[in-house]
Amino acid sequence: MTKKEMLYEGKGKKLFKTDDENLLISEFKDDLTAFNAEKRGNESGKGALNCRISTEIFHLLEKNGIKTHLVETISDTEQVVKKCKIVPIEVIVRNVATGSLTKRLGIKDGTVLPFALVEFCLKDDALGDPFINDEHCLILNLVQNEAQISEIKNMARKINSILTPFFDNKNLRLIDFKIELGLTKDNELVLADEISPDSCRFWDKFSNEKLDKDRFRQDLGNVKMAYEEVLKRILN
């Protein structure tokens, strides 16, 4: 497969065209961003760690019936993925209150939620990715219909139901995570983007030590070591 010109560059990845119009190459970057890219950094080797972690998790999800855009991983930092039309919604699943949820609703940090909370944000950097509800999704034509909203929520909850016990078995608490979904040329809804410490909050099951991008957000240090620890536990 031939890697051609760059199609898109985001905060954490670059997408390249290939000689197959239905496939792209996704290249994971070492860049770190937080607070809508107002804070920026770089951690050598982070892209390779996220690529490996996301590959392992996507394979786990595929085995459990979740369709994804991943075709194969071809290098330490590159995946071949199906070309998708990304649904312009960031889907957030929360098991424990922390971050923006505590600030918006006054819930005490660390509160275990009675059930997984699914939230939507509009994918729009200029607007600061505002939180939106089901009706906003319909009014803004972000989804095809109400049935697709239900499909998105059901997929998000199923992903959570697979990953939460998996990570618990690795002595990691899956606090929350965000996902992106896409539509293939056959209009099939698939999990796209990545699942990694860039897009999830992982706390150690016993100490609640943060092992994710919050180490960068909150200047806790040892970002790469935390990502390496997550990968080590996934593989063990």
From Swiss-Prot:
InterPro entries for this protein: SAICAR_synt/ADE2_N, SAICAR_synt_PurC, SAICAR_synth, SAICAR_synthetase, SAICAR_synthetase_CS
Organismal lineage: Bacteria, Pseudomonadati, Campylobacterota, Epsilonproteobacteria, Campylobacterales
Keyword check for Ligase: yes
Record GO biological process: 'de novo' IMP biosynthetic process; cobalamin biosynthetic process
Gene: purC
CDD domains xrefs: SAICAR_synt_PurC
Family to which the UniProt record says this protein belongs: Belongs to the SAICAR synthetase family.
Molecular-function GO terms, alphabetical: ATP binding; phosphoribosylaminoimidazolesuccinocarboxamide synthase activity
Domain of life: Bacteria
Protein name: Phosphoribosylaminoimidazole-succinocarboxamide synthase
Any Pfam family matching the protein: SAICAR_synt
Claim: Iron-sulfur is one of the keywords in the record: no
This protein's UniProt keywords: ATP-binding, Ligase, Nucleotide-binding, Purine biosynthesis
